[in-house]
Amino acid sequence: LKPGNISNIINQASFLAIIGVAQLVVILTGGINLSIGSIMALSTVLCGPMLVREANVPVILPVFLVILFGAAVGTVNGLMITRLNIPAFLATFATMYVARGAAWLYIGKGVFYGINDQIRFWAMGELVNLNGFRITMPIVLVALFLVVMWFLLAKTTLGRRLYFTGSNPVAAEFSGIP
């Protein structure tokens, strides 16, 4: 393997690492989220038209909308699980297929061309080239995200509560952890 190949693999896996850490938090609490990939796809499809050069939309708007949409769907999943007492597997399974179907209906067989240069930099921009090993923006962002999540899970009360709740919810409740 050459340094360029390794950096390319890390760059492409960076998006999956973020999704994986988000899924880790869900699994720590004893749950499961099957819809995470489909929600990511639907978010991308819905905001794709705003990311083309001709749209003249500030990059922060689609990014904010993707985060807002993901949080809204996560809230719906959470309400189905906690208020309607639907098992997490079934609730997120249903959401997965609704999101997948909506993305397919919305995009059809279309493709977005001419992505905005700002978003292209955030998605693929090279910051440093160390003898063929390219450090790109996604690598830096995922490294920052991993450090923040490590700190949150390992060094904060919230992180300890997540671990305790997932390992034994009854014992966690008796210990005063909601």
Which residues does each predicted region cover?
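Hydrophobic alpha-helical transmembrane segments
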Residues: I9, L16-A17, S38-L42, I60-L68, ...
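Residues that define the loop-to-transmembrane-helix transition and helix capping
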Residues: S35, I60-L61, P87-L90, T157-R160, ...
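Transmembrane helix-bundle core of multi-pass membrane transporters
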Residues: A88-T156, P178
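Single transmembrane alpha-helix segments in multi-pass membrane proteins
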Residues: L1-A55, L79-I86
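Interfacial loop-to-helix junctions that mark the boundaries of transmembrane helices
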Residues: P3-N11, A55-L61, G125-I139
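Alpha-helical transmembrane segments within multi-pass membrane transporters and channels
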Residues: A55-M96
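Generic alpha-helical transmembrane segments of integral inner-membrane proteins
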Residues: V21-A22, L42, L46, F64-V76, ...
